[in-house]
A protein has these predicted regions:
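A short acidic, helix-capping loop that chelates divalent metal ions and anchors anionic groups
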Residues: 43, 185-189
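N-terminal pre-triad scaffold of radical SAM enzymes
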Residues: 5-58, 74-83
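Iron-sulfur (Fe-S) cluster-binding modules
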Residues: 1
Length: 189
């Protein structure tokens, strides 16, 4: 099982047509220019958006680890979060959110199916990116197989930072690879 940290609907830059993009957690790279650093870690990560915080201290009060304090700069994490999710579940303004959730296959497919008509009419489909989706080849292949059974166009957006065997296994289950070339070194390439 792998975690998905975001689902972006009506995406137009992640493959042909209008798409639903699934963002998987975990990436072995640490690119300083990464657009999705919340996808680095394979585990859930608590995210804080200061401008959404109203200073109600609900998160401080419900945290069983006593990990959060309210300061003049907003909520401060003391560094011993267990990612239990109690603070994120109780935050009334979503200033605290958990990036990363396990999805049962039927629930994930139900989310994707919501946009079927738009995807079909636009020639779109589903794109899986990350993080680096090839870190979770078995789970990725399960998702791709299920999408294929349902007739969705399947795209994987990847750095290809994986073994040739993993790349081949995934390539057999999707119609398109989008490859992010992260760095070119003429001495190595």
């Amino acid at each position: 099982m792998a975690l998905i940290f975001d689902i972006k609907r009506f995406a137009i830059n992640d493959g042909p047509g209008i798409r639903t993009t699934l963002f998987m957690k975990g990436c072995p790279l640490r690119c300083v220019w990464c657009h999705n650093p919340e996808g680095f870690d394979e585990k859930p990560v608590k995210m804080y958006t200061k401008k959404k915080c109203i200073g109600c201290k609900t998160c401080v009060e419900v945290c069983p680890q006593k990990n959060l304090v309210l300061t003049t700069e907003g909520i401060k994490d003391l560094g011993h979060c267990t990612a239990c999710g109690k603070c994120t579940n109780e935050c009334p303004t979503l200033a605290l959110e958990m990036a990363g959730k396990e999805w049962k296959m039927e629930d994930l497919m139900a989310e994707v199916e919501k946009e079927r008509q738009v995807m079909e009419e636009s020639g779109g489909g589903v794109t899986i990116c990350g993080g680096e989706p090839l870190m979770h080849t078995d789970y990725l292949c399960e998702v791709l197989n299920e999408l294929g059974k349902r007739g969705f166009h399947r795209t994987v957006d990847t750095t290809l930072f994986a073994s040739p065997e993993k790349v081949k296994k995934v390539a057999e289950r999707c119609e398109l690879f989008l490859v992010d070339l992260k760095l070119m070194d003429s001495a190595k390439h």
